Amino acid sequence: MTYRTLCILAFTALISACSSRPTGPTTPPPESVSAISKWETSGRVGIRTKNDAVSGNFNWQKDPKTFALSIVGPFGQGATHLNQSNDGVVTLAYEDTVVTGNNPETLLQQELGWEFPVNQVTYWIRGLAYPNSAAKISKDPDSQLPNKIEQDGWLITYSNFTKVDGLSLPQKMQVSNPPFRVNLIINQWTIQ
């Protein structure tokens, strides 16, 4: 082999090593909000009960069988973690306490005094009515996005939406059933 041939082969190898390679198949974004099977959201939360008020940051990861919800107060104080594993076991961790059960709503009510319908909120946070009960939905006449859902004794109001992968998802919302009220300001959405 000549010197020139070696240089051409080395240059070709160098160029092909630097070229971009496909990273594998990517999951296309969902075609509708109801088709979102896995999501993560984070932002600010304010929770008001009859006797207490809590504010902080939240992060919520959800896939079809599991979820992990964390609420952390100002300066990292007062962290509360609610998780559901693949086998349906729900764990609530707060302060120095860890309890398990099979129903997130029951754990939150018994341990913290919070009435928070976790199963329904996984739909409401996406701007959808919970499919297993009747709902009254009011929509904005221009955008046709929901501005209010009344369901199971709860009032869900939406005051702002944001576009994520071409879909409109809530950015600011309130879930209330007096005296319990939750305000969410969502800073980030990741969907699949």
From Swiss-Prot:
Lipid-conjugated positions (N-palmitoyl cysteine): C18
Function field: Plays a critical role in the incorporation of lipoproteins in the outer membrane after they are released by the LolA protein.
NCBIfam families the record matches: lolB
Family according to the record: Belongs to the LolB family.
Matches recorded under PROSITE patterns: PROKAR_LIPOPROTEIN
Subcellular localization(s) per the UniProt record: Cell outer membrane
Keyword list, A-Z: Cell outer membrane, Chaperone, Lipoprotein, Membrane, Palmitate, Protein transport, Signal, Transport
CDD domains, A to Z: LolB
Keyword hit for Nucleotide-binding: no
One GO location term (cellular component): cell outer membrane
Subunit structure: Monomer.
InterPro entries assigned to the protein according to its UniProt record, in alphabetical order: LolA/LolB/LppX, OM_lipoprot_LolB
Signal peptide: 1-17
Protein name as catalogued: Outer-membrane lipoprotein LolB
